Amino acid sequence: MSSFDIFSPTTSVSGKFFLEASAGTGKTFTIEQVILRSLLEGNVEQTKNILVVTFTNAATNELKLRIQESLKQALTLFSQALSHPETPLPPYVSSQETKVKQLYXKXRNSLATLDEMNIFTIHGLCRFTLEQHFPWVQPIHPSSMFSEPQTIQQYILDYLRQNSWENVLSPKQYAFLSYHHRATTQQTRHLADRLLQDYASTPNLALPPLSITLQKVKNWSSQYKHLSPLSLEELQDFSLRFKQSDLPIDRELPDFVKQFETDPNSLDILFFPGMVQKFQEENRNKKKLGPPFSPLDPFLKDWLLIAQPFCQKEPIFHTLLKSVQQHLKTYCAQSYSHDESIATLESLLAQNDHVVSQLRKQFQLVLIDEFQDTDKRQWKIFSKLFASPDYSGSLFLIGDPKQSIYEWRNADLPTYLQAKNSFPKESQLILDTNYRSTPQLMQALNHLFSLPSPFLETPQTILYHPLQSKGSASTSYSEFRPIHFFTTQDSQEEALWISKTASYLRSTFAIPFGNMAVLVQDYPQALKLITHSTIPMAYCKEKRIFDRTESPYLLILLLEALLYPENQQKIQAILLSRFFHLSATDIHQHLKIFSSLFFMLNTYLHQYSLLATFYKLMGETVFSQTIGETLLQTPLGDIIFQELEELCLYLDKTTENPHHKLFHLINILDTGKYDEELSFSSQSNDDNVLKITTVHSSKGLEYDVVFCSSLNKVKEKSPSVHMREMYVACTRAKKFLFIPFSSIEKRLQSNKKVSALANYANITQHDNIPHLVETLTASHPEFFSSGTQPPESNISIFSEPLPEQEFFSLPILSSQPIYSFSSTTESQYFTEPFQEISSSSLFPGGSLTGTLIHKLLESLSGNFNASLEEITHKAQTLLKNTILEGFESIISEKIYTAFSTKLPFVSGSFALKDVHPYNIRVEETFLLQENGELWQGIVDLFFEHNNRFFIIDWKTSFLGDEPSLYSPDKLLLYIQRQGLDKQGVLYKRAAKKFLHQFNSSLQIEMAFVFIRGIDDKGNGFLQPSP
């Protein structure tokens, strides 16, 4: 392959080129200069006509900054040349004054419009193209006000509100699912929340289409129509052959018989969860066999085959999830996973030549970086768009097959070679000058990697091309040669050898520890070396914040406590964590104090940032020491503290809304989608700390001294992978490369696990590693050396006290009392307290009665179309052993009346049973600031119906047994005397404040419903004036 010299006047940057860039050859610099030359020479009209595809988001940001710096330098150079014509310019630039003025104007315009340059990851390019050229994939552009998970949530809510589920679920299935995902108890989560959490999951349990299930039902009913009419008594007797189940079937059996008689071909015949559970074969009671055969046996067995999956919560949910995913793919391009976005774009481009033509015209220069990590599908997109003869612009594919070590990311070397072979030989170029390593080390590396011939076989051959060196680094090789092998028997001996040698290099050559690195295969290997090291070492592998400690989960607990300080269980959860490290006894004794702290922090969070609130919390004193001190004293406490800082800062930059911070963090944990920003490195920039990192994490980095411990670690990998990882590891070094090996001679066995060094010895036809080392040091003593003992340093092991921690304080926000209608005294706020009548002939009065009925109403939320029998059953369960035991029937009748009676709201009358279960929220807590006072309240019932929002406050007050005592005028007098009119105003304001973040025009109506007096004549209902 021909050499590519970006500064040569004879080198063209116009055309299609395949550029191989070995380690240390200035690949990123070359990309910058190709872009600069293309702009200056007029091959590209504007920066918006340039497309660069890189591997990571971090790389896109770094590249844009480097391009910006190159343009600034060019601008400065041309400015100097205009003032001082003798200023030397790049060889490809004319020194004519007119030409220099033109170049100055081009560089200035390019710098001003740099933000228009298109620098993407492959997935970013796919999303950009889908949004720009396929609007039907994403008809609504995502609002900048919402993050990606918030946008997806809105699409899920639209799907549910539009009843799109009707295409895949029966009404009973959906009601069943909604009931089990009510946001009313700690054990359940809202259906929309779970759909958002799992929207990227694979719905493996999804049921077949309803049409197929319906056909199975019809076949079943036709097969057993001779059993009609079905005997309820026989079915009840047959059920005795089975053990008692958790779900009662007493009410299901009559309904099943009726359904079989009236409409056996309906899907409703399947939805009897109690029968499905009861008639499982494993529940058969062997002691009650009954007659040897019953026609109901095959009848119910065949029914179970259809009904069992139809009634199970997870298959129903997966069916809904699959439909939601299709909805998101149709209407929200953001919901595509990375692989799906690539597949979608590939498919759409294959059918849209017009879009292909537009993209070719838009991009006059295309550079694909890290091409060795490209897979077949990505290459098909690039090939169709830019490698085609119909593309008239310039294309650079830039990569190095020797550094393709990311096979788990679908990196595909055969695709790389196929793409390379599609270019003519004269367009296959190479960067053949190394700017990283010393000339001596470069020569040693050339020899080391020229021995395997070919370098790789995959099955095509890949050759190693020796590089010349123009590295600025220089050193003396008296004690060691550029590549030095040292013997070691275990991790302890290896760590001591590295410690002594690193100390010697620092004292002799003034190389800081911070410019040295130990490369390992994995964290366990790093941990062993750190444990036995006698000098400071730090593990520097890039990791997600979510991979190492529980800090994200701690932050979720903290955010929940900060956002909902009225919820004692959320407060207790954070108090039990390592933040506070308190016992249950301590929490119980001081819960009020801690609740007051979190109410104060809640206000602090809304006035300041999450990071500021975190620091405020860390400075609070609990039992003689600060919370921060308590955290730092726990295992990994210092790491957790750092990670929490990073997370708080990230969430503060993501959104200002505290609730959205919690939502965003939960979504990251659920979906695994995170920004590059959350790749957290424990790396220290301290020059007095030697770095330890993995080979994969070291790619793209360089160090003066490299200890390749990874080459001595036995791993089960293919010879090709071993070879590529060895190349990446060795080419990180600028001056010295040290490779450990075991001196025990063992004949290599290629069919077993081996180290990368043993694999190399095998490929180069050596008996074992000692034989390899002996051959290299004997044949080329100027490049290779070996030894057993480390050199002695002239100075003692470095030791320096840690710097004293600096702290800063934030202003202390004074606490403020929080009022509620249940905690304020009547005499303080209301001059004429209303005396409630205490004697009732229906059921007892008092606050305990109100609490119990509210609990009953809460348990029935989302099920307002429940029958009287269902309500009574629930009441009997909840009111057992309470003061209301024995009054279940009358209370159930009152509640049933409240659910089924049309409520005369101003906007129109309707019954609660007509409200869709999904649109109902109960026991919603709020905190509202009103005239400088903080008011806390709980909304009994908040729901949406016919595109309007409503609040209902249940009242169990006893005003008498006569219905007329609950007329609107009597109720108005009651709520005015009790101050409940102010309660209604505050509840509406709190709801409006919540809804305002979505739509400021939404209207809310609020009403009081008196359980004792509600009827169809208008009694028991009061809607206060606006």
UniProtKB/Swiss-Prot annotation:
List of catalytic residues: 953 (for nuclease activity)
E.C. code: 3.1.11.5, 5.6.2.4
Ranges for region Nuclease activity, interacts with RecD and RecA: 815-1026
Gene Ontology MF annotations: 3'-5' DNA helicase activity; ATP binding; ATP hydrolysis activity; DNA binding; exodeoxyribonuclease V activity; magnesium ion binding
Keywords assigned: ATP-binding, DNA damage, DNA repair, DNA-binding, Exonuclease, Helicase, Hydrolase, Isomerase, Magnesium, Metal-binding, Nuclease, Nucleotide-binding
Catalytic activities: Exonucleolytic cleavage (in the presence of ATP) in either 5'- to 3'- or 3'- to 5'-direction to yield 5'-phosphooligonucleotides; Couples ATP hydrolysis with the unwinding of duplex DNA by translocating in the 3'-5' direction; ATP + H2O = ADP + phosphate + H(+)
Family: Belongs to the helicase family. UvrD subfamily.
Function, in words: A helicase/nuclease that prepares dsDNA breaks (DSB) for recombinational DNA repair. Binds to DSBs and unwinds DNA via a highly rapid and processive ATP-dependent bidirectional helicase activity. Unwinds dsDNA until it encounters a Chi (crossover hotspot instigator) sequence from the 3' direction. Cuts ssDNA a few nucleotides 3' to the Chi site. The properties and activities of the enzyme are changed at Chi. The Chi-altered holoenzyme produces a long 3'-ssDNA overhang and facilitates RecA-binding to the ssDNA for homologous DNA recombination and repair.
The protein, known as: RecBCD enzyme subunit RecB
Underlying gene: recB
